[in-house]
A protein has these predicted regions:
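N-terminal beta-strand motif that seeds the catalytic metal site of vicinal oxygen chelate
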Residues: 1-19, 69-72, 122-156, 166, ...
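Core segments of cupin and vicinal oxygen chelate
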Residues: 1-2, 9-55, 146-187, 191, ...
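Exposed loop/turn and edge beta-strand positions of beta-sandwich/beta-sheet ligand-binding modules
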Residues: 4, 43, 52, 68, ...
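Fold-core signature of tandem repeat domains
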Residues: 5, 49, 76, 119, ...
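Residue-level structural signal for beta-strand termini and adjacent loop
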Residues: 36, 61, 120-122, 173, ...
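Short, charged/polar, Gly/Pro-enriched secondary-structure boundary elements
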Residues: 54-57, 66, 114-117, 183-187, ...
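Short amphipathic alpha-helices within nucleic acid-binding modules
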Residues: 80-85, 213-220
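Vicinal oxygen chelate
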Residues: 87-141, 170, 178, 221-270
Length: 270
């Protein structure tokens, strides 16, 4: 495939609590060394995690930055071809240089809705550490990233036309579109203010494929017992909690809905 989905980033106030959750439950491993802490200092104990394909960055949330899902990342065979397609079909889309400390990508861009993502190509100068490796297979891995959009068909066309992602047969419908790199999927689901007032456009959730859903649920329970601070959180609480959960469960790739210790929405399937 021309494009591979390779990166997801979250802003968090507690890197280590979140890292424990993703390492313990999903077997993710550290692939980079060193990230900024809450005081702006370099902490060599922090680093991006990986499931063997997708790098997960648990970034320190600083003042003025919202917690939760922030961006994702694509690796392409030819960045110049992407630039040419953007210039031809989406001239209003901006491409910027990444900051030098970013280990995954040399560029940052966005889709027509403004959802930002990193853009990488093998051989870029600042792609380093674990992102240079071939990776590995493991039984629990990130299989999709979900976006909410008021114009999902337009967004799906963008990811197909520019990045050559392909529709997933049998999944699209009811205003939702699922496009894939052959392994990982971008789910583009409708946004509106009818479902519930707090439903926001933009990055919505991401999900894991696991070897056995019941085994994963048992591991969730064990984590809650052994390390309560890193336990998953219930979604169906508060005024709109049940609506949020039902809305997440409507994702075609969801068999079990949950939230991580920070409240980032996740789903599991097997």
């Amino acid at each position: 495939m021309f494009t591979k989905i390779r990166h997801v980033a979250i802003h968090t106030d507690d890197h280590f609590r979140m890292a424990h959750f993703y390492k313990t439950l999903f077997g993710m491993k550290k692939i980079t060394a060193g990230m900024t802490d809450q005081n702006g200092n370099y902490d060599k104990e922090r680093g991006h995690l990986s499931d063997g394909v997708i790098g997960l960055a648990l970034l320190q949330r600083q003042p003025g930055i919202s917690a939760g899902l922030d961006h994702f990342g694509l690796e392409v065979e030819d960045v110049q071809k992407v630039r040419d397609r953007l210039k031809q079909y989406y001239p209003d889309v901006f491409v910027a240089e990444s900051q030098s400390h970013v280990p995954f990508a040399g560029l940052r861009t966005h889709d027509p809705d403004g959802n930002q993502f990193d853009l990488s190509q093998k051989g870029m100068a600042n792609v380093r550490e674990g992102y240079l490796q071939e990776g590995w297979d493991q039984p629990r891995w990130i299989n999709h990233v979900a976006i909410r959009s008021a114009r999902p068909a337009h967004l799906a066309e963008y990811y197909q036309k520019v990045f050559e992602l392909r529709p997933v047969e049998g999944l699209s419908g009811n205003g939702s579109y699922y496009v894939t790199d052959g392994k990982v999927t971008i789910a583009i689901r409708p946004w509106d203010m009818i479902s519930y007032r707090g439903l926001m456009a933009g990055l919505d959730h991401f999900g894991f494929k696991v070897e056995n859903l019941e085994a994963a649920k048992k591991d969730l329970d064990n984590l809650a017992t052994t390390t309560p601070a890193s336990a998953a959180r219930r979604i169906a609480i508060g005024r709109d909690g049940e609506k949020r959960q039902k809305n997440l469960e409507a994702c075609k790739l969801c068999r079990h809905a949950l939230a991580d210790p920070d409240g980032v929405l996740l789903d599991l399937t097997d």
